[in-house]
Amino acid sequence: VLMIALTITLCDQFASHVCKPIFTRFRPTHHPDFMDQVKVVFGYRGGKYGFISSHAANSFGFAMLLALIFRNRWLTGSLFLWATLNAYSRIYLGVHFITDIIPGALSGLFFGWVVYRLYRLGVVRWHLPEESVWLSTRKAHVMAVAIVGVIVFLFVLADPLVSVLK
């Protein structure tokens, strides 16, 4: 849990407090040339700047860390499917360009890998029991099915949920 928190913190702080203030690239919903042409959902426009996407960084950082720790192809596939859909949703909502998403995803992959390396150093240095964090194949499959199940559930119920939220 500590490694997940560290990954999300690094990804989010890098995207929000390093990249966005340095690059100051407008989101599609704030770009003066075409902000009026961007269709927004529920009036949500996001903050002023969008490079790089924090959602993409956080999602891919989380997926990378867990994929490296648990090393289960079904869990890895479902985590990266979730991360990809989460990142795509930012484009769909009109709050990011694809060129915000890809660098965000890449930075997330990097920070997920860095935190995994720190985790491995801790396991070796302090002789931590690895067995306590490794998932059995059955548990990993259950987690993968749960993640995919939530994704399918949200796709099936997307229209009714939006109707309720309106």
Predicted regions and their residues:
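Interfacial segments of alpha-helical transmembrane regions
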Residues: V1-F14, T76-G77
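Residue-level detector of alpha-helical recognition elements and their boundaries
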Residues: M3, D33-F34, L81, T99
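Transmembrane alpha-helix/helix-exit interface in multi-pass inner-membrane proteins
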Residues: T9-T29
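Alpha-helical transmembrane-segment detector that highlights a single hydrophobic TM helix
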Residues: T29-Q37
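Membrane-embedded catalytic cores of phosphoryl/pyrophosphoryl-handling enzymes
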Residues: K39-L165
